[in-house]
Amino acid sequence: MTQETRKNEIINTAAKLFKEKGYSAVTMRDLATAMGIKAASLYNHITSKQDILKAIIITIAEEFTAGMHAIMNSDASNIEKLKKIVALHINITSNNTNGMASLNNDWMHLEDQLDYYLQLRNEYETNFLSIIQRGISSLEIKANNPEIIMFSMLTTLRSLYLWIPKKEDLSANDLAHSLSEVLIEGINI
């Protein structure tokens, strides 16, 4: 097994343990046991539990940021951009439900990357809010409080990591379509 593959295996196993127990409760010994190796062997591939958490959270946050940039730069209507945001959340969450649990529940444990993470999150939310505000201005979206619209949508989208693993019979495309209908129909004019 290559160094990078083993590192990814460690990160994925840690994400699963963090989801099950929470970041603070997981030890390097727990991680080693889950992988069937000695704790000292982990340090051949990673430097600390904190580095694992950073790898999980920052990778996902950067993926969301890149997705949002693509959405912002598209020529789609504001309603279509909101649908693309729903699809972005579903695709990222479907591909990494364990990592999404860390993003939602353990971000505050980031140490030297906390400010960077918060910058990414704030930029994402600012862009999301901007789409909603432009949709209200262009009469695509009902004139409600844009922050309430955004946080209502984000609350649903951020909790998908809990629900998606239970619905293996539902494709990401079907879920994106259905969830867009539910979340956006109420604000669409």
Task: Describe the predicted segments one by one.
Residues R6-E9, L17-D51, A55:
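Helix-turn-helix
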